[in-house]
Design a protein with these regions (language model features):
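Conserved, structured core segments of small domains
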Residues: 2-104
């Protein structure tokens, strides 16, 4: 399966601020086993479900070719919808191709 043009990571504004000046993006506890990423049409739904207490979220666009690790397109356990998960890797700032603030 070819790589998508972009994948997206959703961060809280606080997480985004905390990683400024660092070599990689900040990750949350939910990213311990693998890093959760999204396709464009999944961003709003994921933000509403998992970031409902945040009035705004930061959506970071990433070039998947610049992500170290294994990018896997798979369903969450017990689910049917496919998501991108990055195993054995991290999100370097060098992979960031765009950033936008989205009202949630």
């Amino acid at each position: 399966m070819p790589l998508p043009a972009h994948v997206y990571k959703i961060l809280t504004p606080a997480a985004w601020q905390s990683c400024q000046g660092q070599p990689r993006l900040a990750l949350g506890a939910d990213d311990a086993q693998f890093i959760h990423l999204a396709e464009p049409d999944q961003v709003n739904r994921i933000a509403a479900k998992f970031f409902s207490k945040e009035p705004q979220v930061i959506v970071v666009e990433l070039d998947p070719a610049k992500l170290p690790g294994r990018l896997v397109h798979e369903a969450n356990p017990g689910g049917a919808t496919l998501y991108y998960h990055l195993y054995d890797g991290y999100l370097p700032f060098s992979a960031v191709t765009g950033v936008k603030t989205v009202n949630n």
